[in-house]
């Protein structure tokens, strides 16, 4: 008999992840109930009709009758109803924990405030280039449990802090916390609380890949890898060499690739490449395969993506910059001949925007702020304009553009105050860029 057969298991949250939990636990002959706090959740039409469903609130009675609760990453474990169930002895886990208990092949785990989707996809492409049967999922693409249906020799998972909160059995072959900057401060008590959730990725990991420029990424206590390697611009195992005006991606004394041969550009992307290379080498991927992937990888949509270029003006969609750290990374080391027209705003999730002040208060940077926290952001720039919407901002700035200028959407905020997702925000920016120029 398997561990879940005839167990009473309540799944909280529908959508892709919740449905993957339903499918998996049905295959394990568990007795399932589903709760979603939304009145009309997405995925309701795909739920088998014989599965009991409660919507609109958390059903405390169902929770207390459960042997196990599989909680959506979108719901905090600190929620009173969940705490009541925990105190009654009910086990609370997430879909990643279910996956880790079932997976029999090595797992690469990637988390961080910024860059994790790029690094996850890079490691996936590196493994593919080496001929490895690899599955990618978690917080990107398909839910992790769906990967169990594929013929995989390796799993590469992007993991959020929310997912890691309820994961106990990861034991990654290689893991990294890319960086730690303020994000989701509406969910965590403080930065340290958020950091501790991230560090769980190192628990029982074979190799930890550390960012030598950010000591907050270093594991501690029980959350440490057995062996570590590091990446940074200088003084690390994986580093960036500058010689005769050219830059090279390095591992120790060996050249991985001249930066000019990589399709990704910008210092923050070079750090992403170094982290991905370290993870790939930790699981035995050879450098030739890594080089092949780096020469062909085109980057991800909405991540510092050139979406339009005309009359010497570049339009960059960095809508995935949903927190301050991501926008700081985009601005660091950015060279522009003319003016930078920076679009900022949305839902700041309680973040401290002051870190942006020094970067954006420069003669060549003009800020156009919009959305729920637009007024807060506008205060940090002496050259700022305030609008209700991004479209209004773009219509205003368009006539001022000159050759050599860049229009950059890197909002430092979530999108949900005005858009269905950061993708929708990026798509609107791209549409406006292409229509208005």
Swiss-Prot record:
UniProt xrefs under InterPro entries: Mur-like_cat_sf (IPR036565), Mur_ligase_C (IPR004101), Mur_ligase_C_dom_sf (IPR036615), Mur_ligase_cen (IPR013221), MurD (IPR005762)
Q: Where does ATP bind?
A: 112-118
Q: Which Pfam families match?
A: Mur_ligase_C (PF02875), Mur_ligase_M (PF08245), MurD-like_N (PF21799)
This entry's Gene Ontology molecular function terms read: ATP binding; UDP-N-acetylmuramoylalanine-D-glutamate ligase activity
Q: State its role.
A: Cell wall formation. Catalyzes the addition of glutamate to the nucleotide precursor UDP-N-acetylmuramoyl-L-alanine (UMA).
Entry's family note: Belongs to the MurCDEF family.
Q: What is this protein called?
A: UDP-N-acetylmuramoylalanine--D-glutamate ligase
Q: Which organism is it from?
A: Haemophilus influenzae (strain ATCC 51907 / DSM 11121 / KW20 / Rd)
């Amino acid at each position: 008999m398997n561990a879940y057969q005839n167990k009473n298991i309540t799944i909280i949250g529908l959508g892709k992840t919740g449905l993957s939990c339903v499918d998996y636990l049905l295959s394990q002959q568990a007795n399932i109930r589903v709760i979603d706090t939304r009145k009309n959740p997405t995925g309701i039409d795909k739920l088998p009709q014989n599965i009991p469903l409660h919507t609109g609130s958390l059903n405390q009675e169902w929770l207390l009758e459960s042997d196990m609760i599989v909680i959506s990453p979108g719901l905090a474990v600190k929620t009173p109803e969940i705490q009541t169930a925990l105190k009654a002895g009910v086990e609370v886990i997430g879909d990643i924990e279910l996956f880790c208990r079932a997976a029999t092949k090595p797992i690469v785990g990637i988390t961080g405030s910024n860059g994790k989707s790029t690094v996850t996809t890079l490691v996936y492409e590196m493994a593919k280039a080496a001929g490895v049967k690899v599955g990618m999922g978690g917080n990107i693409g398909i839910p992790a449990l769906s990967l169990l249906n594929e013929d995989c020799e390796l799993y590469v998972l992007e993991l959020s802090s929310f997912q890691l909160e309820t994961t106990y059995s990861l034991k990654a072959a290689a893991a990294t916390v890319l960086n730690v900057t303020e994000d989701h401060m509406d969910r965590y008590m403080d930065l340290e609380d958020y950091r501790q959730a991230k560090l769980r990725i190192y628990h029982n990991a074979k190799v930890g890949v550390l960012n030598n420029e950010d000591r907050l990424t270093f594991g501690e206590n029980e959350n440490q890898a057995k062996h570590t390697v590091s990446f940074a611009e200088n003084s690390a195992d994986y580093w960036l060499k500058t010689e005769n005006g050219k830059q090279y991606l390095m591992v120790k004394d060996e050249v991985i690739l001249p930066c000019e041969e990589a399709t990704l550009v910008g210092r923050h992307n070079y750090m992403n490449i170094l982290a991905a290379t370290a993870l790939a080498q930790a699981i035995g991927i050879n450098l030739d395969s890594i080089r092949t992937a780096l020469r062909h990888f085109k980057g991800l949509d909405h991540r510092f993506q050139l979406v339009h270029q005309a009359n010497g003006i570049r339009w960059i969609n960095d809508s995935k910059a949903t927190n301050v750290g991501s926008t700081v990374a985009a601005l660091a080391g950015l060279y522009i001949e003319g003016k930078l027209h920076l679009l900022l705003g949305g839902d700041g999730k309680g973040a401290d925007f002051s870190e942006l002040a020094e970067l954006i208060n420069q003669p060549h940077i003009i800020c156009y702020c919009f959305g729920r926290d637009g007024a807060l952001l506008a205060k940090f720039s002496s050259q700022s304009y305030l609008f209700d919407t991004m479209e209004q901002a773009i219509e205003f700035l368009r006539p001022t553009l000159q050759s050599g200028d860049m229009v950059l959407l890197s909002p430092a905020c979530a999108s949900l105050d005005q858009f269905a997702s950061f993708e929708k925000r990026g798509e609107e920016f791209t549409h406006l860029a292409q229509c208005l120029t």
